[in-house]
């Protein structure tokens, strides 16, 4: 996707603190964990959408990795927060609706990330433990550069290319066959012989640095931000002739569905792919120990600047394919591979100004305006400063970061770019601080509308209280409303929305659906006379708007731009309630209970603060109960609130945000006006062909043909839940030799019991 001429600092989650500035997960209570889980879930889900679908990432790889790691840590400590819709259980993002969908016969998974020697050692130890290998037993691992491009799957039948698809969400990708045929590195017909009748080759589409520079020099308008964006935007073109004119390359490194095995090791497979006519990375090598793996990583990192294409780490893979098969997959990553990421690139420059951007939820986000400096081959002039605590040298828990050094205009600051996206300010050189530099005074009023900007207890950011009267919030909500994962109206992008808002043609989403009445037949000249418009383009816009009068419930919920309601949460809500009407009724009914919940949480917070001041043990549960006892709630309100917070992936923080939005008179009126123009479609029913999907399994006794870990992983991959004990909720018990009390209890409860051979028939199904 083409980017602006200058990099624009758009904070990942408005005003969100960097993970390094957050308190340890072990120090979080349930309320704090819920709030942070909701924020991180939205941040990671939006980052997935921007990176995989829109080719316009707005956070760095390092920031993304750190946020996802922290999300995983929170879910590990608070298991009730984990759910099937969490970004930790997702791969990529939903496929772009402009392209035909292609189901992947074998999922295109992501890779587990590592960042240190300890991570690499732990990976090897996990592999050995899973395979039950002795410490001295040989274990070969391949090491290859991790190309920073766009993942692509190529399907060959009889040696002929019949289909090319992007990763998409890992299960369903986008059909880009016509575009892939124009790439010189992708053979239309496989070379040699001995290839399987059906062969899916997977690899990375990328652009070299030299070709990237030439492409940007040839562009007369907007230029690409980096080679990865250029490659992704070039491949995902509706017109194949555009792709053909772009200098795309392709490295093959993996495979999906095959009708017959074509290699016994990863390295042999790489050589066979090369013989079939594919480019494979010449730096791929075999390592026999952790020390050799780390040496390969260090050598490849040293070569990074001279390779001529972008890489962001080294990928390790267990070489023996029989071992790979035994190790199998987690829900989103293979157990037999690890991506060992490179550290961020850094440079020093002067901070010339601090500007405040106002996001769609009202968050005031500080942006550093820098003296231009080259970092990682890209000129950087903007960087995010996260929030006022980060500027002041404090973490979210009040602890010092950067040794307590604050950031001031005129300072020399260290800037880093990890993943070639939005830069961050990492450090300050106090020795070079100008004597006249004053501490930065974070604004307490909105710079866009003048409304008070307040910071609520437990929040890391200040937010404008102006709501829709704030032009910055209004236009950002409109930009979000027309984004690809929301209404995605063809011809109505963010730029046009800003123009129409500026000129007074639209002020809220509902106005989009009255454009034709106001500027259509009889008044068409007003629209067609706009710069760059004509009668045909105006008519096309109206037609595109008409098509979006029917909208899936999940898209509508995401499009509303309610705080914490990201794409995944919107899908969870849609599945839980099934219709717009049911959701409205539930929220209206639950409102008194939502307010009571807020009173109870405030009481719990006051109890904690009082206990801290008095040096005693806090009793927040008792404080909550006492506060709730003062509120007279109907059973219907209690049931509606309980149902909302119990919905998969929701929880109290998101539920409160949703309730507040629907209870706000001005916001609810805008929502009602919008919905009056729409037909809201219910979610499609989920389908699965697994015989054990949704069922609860228990394993007992000794399994002789696979390890317990392998069996559990396979069951979960087929959609089952594996429990540790037998109960009335158990659907199936798999009993090996030595089964004891669990088998007896299953018999008493009438639960079906099968042996390992029957289990293998299901697992290999």
From Swiss-Prot:
Q: Which family does it belong to?
A: Belongs to the NAD-dependent DNA ligase family. LigA subfamily.
Domain BRCT span(s) in chain numbering: 687-765
Q: Which residues form the active site?
A: 146
- Protein name according to UniProt: DNA ligase
Annotated signal peptide? none
GO terms (molecular function) for this protein are:
DNA ligase (NAD+) activity; metal ion binding
Gene3D superfamilies reported in the protein's UniProt record: 5' to 3' exonuclease, C-terminal subdomain, 6.20.10.30, BRCT domain, DNA ligase/mRNA capping enzyme, Helix hairpin bin, Nucleic acid-binding proteins
In the UniProt record, the gene name given for this protein reads ligA
Give the keywords, sorted: DNA damage, DNA repair, DNA replication, Ligase, Magnesium, Manganese, Metal-binding, NAD, Zinc
Cofactor(s) needed, names only, are: Mg(2+); Mn(2+)
| Pfam families linked | BRCT (PF00533), DNA_ligase_aden (PF01653), DNA_ligase_OB (PF03120), DNA_ligase_ZBD (PF03119), HHH_2 (PF12826)
Q: Which reaction(s) does its UniProt entry say it catalyses?
A: NAD(+) + (deoxyribonucleotide)n-3'-hydroxyl + 5'-phospho-(deoxyribonucleotide)m = (deoxyribonucleotide)n+m + AMP + beta-nicotinamide D-nucleotide
Positions binding Zn(2+) in this chain are: 446, 449, 464, 470
What functional role does this protein have? DNA ligase that catalyzes the formation of phosphodiester linkages between 5'-phosphoryl and 3'-hydroxyl groups in double-stranded DNA using NAD as a coenzyme and as the energy source for the reaction. It is essential for DNA replication and repair of damaged DNA.
- The record's top EC class is ligase
Region named Disordered: 1-34
EC numbers, comma separated: 6.5.1.2
What GO biological process terms does the UniProt entry carry, in alphabetical order?
DNA repair; DNA replication
Q: Name one GO cellular component term.
A: cytosol
